[in-house]
């Protein structure tokens, strides 16, 4: 009987993903991949998502200081089998070593966009108006309590 599919990852998937993220970060930090694009770039692994069968690991990476981030991600995908072999030593407890897929992490860009929106004059004006209302409400409550 097939299991019902859920949208949220299981506890095991989360635990394994975190172990894979640590092992992958250590491998990239040691600089074992011989590729000019990757050697000259610091690559941050922000998240790893595992497939339900734990055979595919999608790593979300942020190439820091790289001009062409897509080229760095493409180079990582090109060297995915090499990375898989290097990470396998740290993940000996796994029955199957996952296949690695690298994707560009856009969460930092989204954070910056939201931060810019929050700092915009329109939002600041609305927040100031809300602050004025709450101050007026507090002053009114203080007068009522006296």
Curated annotation (Swiss-Prot):
This is Ribosome-binding factor A. Gene3D superfamilies: 3.30.300.20. InterPro entries: KH_dom-like_a/b, RbfA, RbfA_dom_sf, Ribosome-bd_factorA_CS. GO terms for biological process: maturation of SSU-rRNA. Belongs to the RbfA family. Monomer. Binds 30S ribosomal subunits, but not 50S ribosomal subunits or 70S ribosomes. It comes from Mesorhizobium japonicum (strain LMG 29417 / CECT 9101 / MAFF 303099) (Mesorhizobium loti (strain MAFF 303099)). The keyword Cytoplasm applies.
């Amino acid at each position: 009987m097939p299991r019902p599919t859920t949208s949220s990852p299981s506890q095991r998937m989360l635990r394994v993903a975190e172990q894979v993220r640590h092992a992958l970060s250590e491998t990239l930090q040691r600089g074992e991949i011989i590729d000019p694009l990757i050697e000259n770039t610091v690559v941050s692994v922000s998240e790893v998502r595992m497939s339900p069968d734990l055979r595919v690991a999608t790593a979300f990476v942020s190439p820091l200081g790289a001009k062409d981030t897509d080229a760095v991600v493409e180079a990582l995908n090109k060297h995915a089998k090499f990375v898989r072999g290097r990470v396998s030593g740290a993940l000996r407890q796994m029955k199957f070593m996952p296949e690695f897929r690298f994707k560009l992490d856009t969460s930092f860009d989204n954070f910056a966009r939201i931060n810019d929106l929050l700092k915009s004059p329109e939002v600041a004006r609305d927040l100031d108006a809300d602050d004025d209302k709450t101050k007026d409400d507090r002053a009114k409550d203080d007068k009522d309590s006296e």
